[in-house]
Amino acid sequence: MSENTTQENVFHTNIPSVLAMEFSIKPWQVENTVALLDEGATIPFIARYRKEKTGELDDQTIRNISDRLTYLRNLDERKQEVYTAILSQEKMTDEIEKSIGNAVTLAEVEDIYRPFKPKRKTRASIAKEKGLEPLAKIILEQNKKTVLAQILPQYINEEKGVLTVEDALKGAMDIIAEDVSDNPQVRTVLKKLYNRTGVVESKGDQEKESVYTQYYDFSQTVNKLPGHRVLALNRGEKEGFLKVNITVDLSAAVTEIEKIYIKGKNECADVVKEAIADSYTRLIHPSLDTETRNNLTDMANEGAIKLFGDNLRQLLLVPPVKDKVCLALDPGYRTGCKMAVVDATGKVLEVGVVYMTLPNHNKDIAKKTLKSLIKKHNVDIISIGNGTATKETEMFVASLIKELDKKISYMVVSEAGASVYSASKLAAAEFPDYDVSLRSAVSIARRLQDPLAELVKIDPKSIGVGQYQHDMPKARLEESLDGVVEYCVNTVGVDLNTASAPLLERVSGLNKTTAKNIVAYRE
């Protein structure tokens, strides 16, 4: 037993030292950054206004430090929980304590705790209740002098349900199988094997049509499977079209375990080999199949979230079209094409509906209406939403421009999220007298004039620049996308005289209350 048997926190990772090494920066930079994060300072604020404290670390590095800081603190906390749990069972040893201290991932800590974790009733636990654990230990020792035929009868106990020598041997093998399954060394070796040689396979019912037909007879190695395929397989499985599993060469896996357990050639070793084979197929493989797929999903999620963030950043940082009066068209068929004219500052001048596409089109009236608006408000540019009927609307506008006296241009802009914004409380407060569809037209005009200022009003997840966003961990996705929005706003800056409250609240050092107060004071 370790001398350190108190239940005080005995695991204190030198986090500044670890982070300094991981990020190749000075320990004092880490210490100051951690202190600022613990005080509640936001990452954009630290990156821009505390450069002297951090040694001019950029926002992405600070964000990465924040993520790792959280992980390492959780790791220390879990180490202590596991240490305390094993200690309470009076099974702590110096070796186990050292293993816990040396663990660098949560998965390693869980593998160490696995043999001590309270279990539901298992075949092994039932065998132990029947008094067969000593027999299992004898077999595991693999002493050449052990003769099973002589010792097995000693464990027959009718009262406990061990009626024959076969019952005794089977129970002992169940105990050995669970011991093998719970062995951290076994799991570490096999995880490497799964990551190196494992193959992800999926099967589907050829008679069922779906978007997953390419995965109906699919296989690819674990270490080469791209994230988007992981997420596609997960969704196909969730929707009931696919059956997905990981396969590993059985003999290779069993051989790796035997290297750890088998001590030579004898009768007991043969029994242990049989128990190892059972352990792998019944206990280890299902567990590692799940764990490996979870790891693949975690990596795929992180990759998808990063791609989502990169796409969002590009969209938010599209250069604005400044000082232009804009006519926006939100194309449609049956309900017509919604339009809005806004001045160079984004103020709405006029809204309406024209019918230039089937089935209710009247192109002559539509042209006359638009020409009148362009002349009345001295429109400089036309913004067309890229949704339904965009192609027809674009052709109509191109024809219209040729008939105008003044030089005017048009641009097709993304209307992703416009419908979400138009139905939001923010849009209702901004345009209480406008129909939802007309609010969308206003948004399409403004996102051409200043994409960042307009798009910050929309939930980043609704802008539609990422794959499988509904399969992502919601909190992690929101945290990442909020970070991107903050980065963009603070990189570009805002005009205090014109910026909206949603834009101002993204500025480092401001919040919803101060943003609203600024707008109220300005008005």
Cite the ranges covered by each PLM segment.
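Generic start-of-chain signal for non-secretory N-termini
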Residues: M1-E31, D38
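Duplex nucleic acid-engaging cores and interfaces of nucleic-acid transaction enzymes
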Residues: S2, T61-N64, Y71, L75-A328, ...
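Long, highly charged, low-complexity intrinsically disordered interaction regions
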Residues: E3-N4, H12-I15, N74-K91, G101, ...
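Amphipathic alpha-helical segments within well-ordered protein domains
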Residues: S17-A20, V34, A47-R50, S66, ...
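N-terminal cofactor/phosphate-binding cores enriched in small/glycine residues
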Residues: K26-Q60
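Short, well-structured alpha-helical segments
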Residues: V30-A35, I62, E97, G101, ...
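Active-site catalytic pocket residues across diverse enzymes, especially alpha/beta-hydrolases
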Residues: R50, I401, R522
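Short, well-ordered loop/turn and helix-capping segments at boundaries between secondary-structure elements
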Residues: E52-G55, E141, D182, D450, ...
